Amino acid sequence: IFLFIIGALCLCGCADDFATKINLDGNSSEGEFNSEAALYGTVQDNYGKPIAGVLVSDGMQTTETDAKGNWQLFSDLKLRRFVFVTIPAGYEVPSKNGIPQFWQRIPENEKQFKADFTLMKRAGSGDRYTILMTADPQIRAKTAGTDKYMFHSIDIYEDMCKDMKELAATITDRPVYSICLGDMVHNNMSLWEDYCEGLKDFSFPVFHVIGNHDHIQNAASDDLAVAEYEKYLGPTNYAVDLG
């Protein structure tokens, strides 16, 4: 589901608990953390300056950083796998191999986890940007070719990545982003590394939405069905503000 409202972009890949916003308590607003908070941390820019008003979520609850950039959530870590920020308008996050790093995985069996995030001020005006939209690469083994349903082999995907890099290189007056609308792999979880290999040299971040063919089809639960997607691309539900 994609929702564009006055330059704001919200990405949701699959059904999950709806996020509810909670406020920081008095301790956190004074720059201290409650010892009972399961998740906590600080959001700052790349110069070490705290950033107030950034939304931070565990996928179920959402809070906002205070004046000192601090945030905390009283989460049940047995039920949560990620903590992530909503990238605010005017900021970027570091990318690793083309994948934006706005999230951190919560280690298993942790009772408390500290997650700090660094945001970088976006260069130039935030009102102009280019989004390269892709959908349904549905990569298959090189030997598979293209069948009657047009599910593509990896070499066609590699050509697409090459075209995207060349196009992005011609856009120098505004930021470039990409969004893949799902079905990156066609039910073959062994191809995730091949898919991510195509992104590693991108100079722009690629955001993703999970598709039905990106789920483990015979998984016993929804959580297990998205495990491979999450391993490579992070949480299935998140938001980004542009413009």
Predicted regions, residues:
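Extended active-site neighborhood of metal-dependent phosphoesterases/phosphodiesterases
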Residues: 88-95, 100-109, 118, 189-243
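Short, acidic Ser/Thr/Gly-rich low-complexity loop/linker segments typical of extracellular
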Residues: 57-74
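Short Pro-Gly-centered beta-turn/loop motif in secreted/extracellular proteins
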Residues: 72-82
